[in-house]
Amino acid sequence: MSITPSKLANQLLRFFCAPHRLEEVQGDLHEEFTYQVQRMGERRARWRYWWDVLGFIKPFAIKRKSTDQYSNPAITDMLRTYFKIAFRNLSQNKGYSTLTIFGLALGLAVSLFSILYVADEFSYDRFNEKADRIYRINSDISFSLKGLKAATSPTPMGETLKRDFPEVEEATRLGKYGSHLVKSDQIVIREQGVLYADSTVFSVFTLSVLAGNPTKALAEPQSVVITESISKKYFGTTDALNRVLVFDDNDVRHVTAVIKDIPAQSHVQADFLLPLHETKDAKAAKWGNHIFTTYLLLKPGTNPQAVEAKFEKILQTYVDPALRRYFNTSLAETRKAGNYFNYSLIPLTKIHLYSDREGELSPNNSIQYVYLFLIIGLFILLIAVFNFINLTTARSAKRAREVGVRKVAGSTRAELVFQFLSESLLTTFFALLAGVGLVYFLLPAFNTLAAKKLVFDQVIDVSSVLYLLAGTGFVGLLAGLYPALYLSSFKPITALAGKVWVMPGRQSLRSYLVIFQFSLSVLLIIGTLLINQQMRYIQTKKLGFDKEQVVIINTAQSTEQDVTTFKREVLRSPAIKTGTVSGFLPVTSNRWNDMWYPEEETDQKLSVGMQEWQVDPDYVATLGMQLLKGRNFTAGRIADNQTVIINESAAKQFGYQHPVGKTIHKTGGEQLTIIGVVKDFHYESLRNTIEPVGLVLDATALGGNAGHSFDNVSFRFQTADVSTALASIERTWKQIALGRPFTYSFLSEEFDAMYRAEQRIEQLFMVFASVAILIACLGLFGLSAFAAEQRQKEIGVRKVLGASVTGIVTLLSKDFLKPVLIAIVIASPVAWWAMTKWLQGFAYKVDMDWWVFAVAGFLSIGIALLTISVQSIKAALVNPVKSLRSE
């Protein structure tokens, strides 16, 4: 039995001695006590021990705080170390780092473009200070059981509502009459951005006035308000008050105000504002004229639904008498026949994304396309995030021993999770820098592709930077959380043994993520192929007219003599085959239908809504239309002034099997005799069905002097040498037009312009599909590389046993092809459903053939095989001696 010192002495020592010195002091005293017991006996040794204990109660040993005491640091104390380790790991694994950072950078760049685009779309018209109280009046009208959704409303409606409805604070109207020839002392230009506006426009919309009095600017006679850029363009300065501009040769106007350029994020775009009250339509003030768009500024706190509820009173009080006066019918009879007249309000801030009506002041976007853009951007970011997760977990075997050593050294799981999250955040931060760089360099190309005017300053302002950092942090946590939890879960013994590899063939999370990535890629490929197929169908479909080799010369506001002489002189050129003067072309229909009745009928149920186009006798021949029955107009034949050529749709709706010689009449008494029927031709987008159209002669085509409504002269070339033909036309124009600018376009280009939105969608889909496939393939490339590295000893053994290179490549590839095949199976029905919905917007469309899905599938498999094979072949060609030398 060992002899021990006095317990009381030990307690006294523990009480006085500093904890960080106790072990050392007590150990020394116990050794000394054992020695003294042997030397002088137990009794004397105990007294000596007490003496030594009392002797150690000195200032150096008495209880006090340690100056070098080490305590377990908090997780946040290790941040610097974690980021340093993360940076070293990224530097040591340059291939892995490049794949993950580049993939994330692409995903972040696409998502940034998506956010910029969506934010820009939702910002439309919000710069107006009273935007939340401004509403536009929409019209829903049906005649002949054909509905018309218009952005315009009756000419007197705004003024009437302001007078009769106390909820309306102010009203203003805007109107557009096409292009105008504008001339100053220095230049003459045909301008498209001319709007007519009431003087109250400044009270409703936020227009920053640089010079002039906004309350009087449009109230003065022969006035014009111009923008800052127009002022510099025509006068070289913004000091343009009282300067003179001449519109259409003889309309002299004085500048009464200069305003700042209207922001691009406005559905109302104008360079010139002219007084609307001076127009003939405004002076006529007819309730049957839907020429202008009307905007209401409601009083604060007004419920727009309450205003809409009062529109029935407007219909009964004003519209019903107009119907009786001009159409010999009543509102009740119109509704009884199945037709309708309705008015509604749409908030100003919703017009750009939620309105697609006749008479829109500018082309609007669709909220469906905006959401689609946002969703695709999000999906591509998810593909990049899943890449990071896959590549990080695939490297688990390499990090396993590191995890094991850290756990043995005392690291907790929370500390390991924090370390791996730090690495993820650092990777994401580098990816953000690269992504922002991509946005900077690619923004001009994106603006061209998306028809936008986005600026890089929107990315780097303070609020955007904060959102970017917060978003990047979220993406970093999202991407790094699962790998961090997965890697930190390894048991030290298993981790140090390196037995943590999961084979790719197992249905692990990595397989599901690959399936998700390629499902989105296949979906985008199928969408791109089908959109491309529909666009090719539009370009190659027989339209009922020949759009090639036809040039359009804008002659609006030209005199009758000028137009007639110009056409006659141009036709002398051997480069020109034929020409026509017209107000309407198959790409610029008015879409406004008049009510026409067969023979002597007056019943609204038998009426036909038909457009009336004024043309000359050469119209049908110049546009290459096919005359199915009857004859064409004859130049100089006065009787043809009371005739009409209709299309097949009109003949069908009138119920005429043999329409030639039949008569039709319009409400009000105008009667025309049908002399011919042309084959149906498309005059609108293929989204719409072909409706009735009637071609009638203008008075000037017969040598009359009633004035003309012609805006264009179109010529068909005799030669393929377009430049020679255009030069000939331009020479003649300069001789006759007396200084007016020569502006032209091609009929084929005007036709293509109707599908610009679809063309942009096609291009965006192609870009998105390419980016999605690239990111997915980066991940697949990394996974196949890690798989080949982990199985190098297995490959070596197989080669020693006689396996061929082809067999090994097949072995390594098949496990990765399974998720791709599953992705094709999942994506195909989803793509079929989505594209069916999209194609429903077209009245004339392609069938979704099976080969489109087959091509998308084979393309995906081919790309995946090509990506995997690079690493598989490389691994299969390695000398087995190198892979087995450590065994």
Question: Which residues does each PLM region occupy?
Answer:
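Hydrophobic, regular-secondary-structure patches
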Residues: 121, 135-193, 200, 232-237, ...
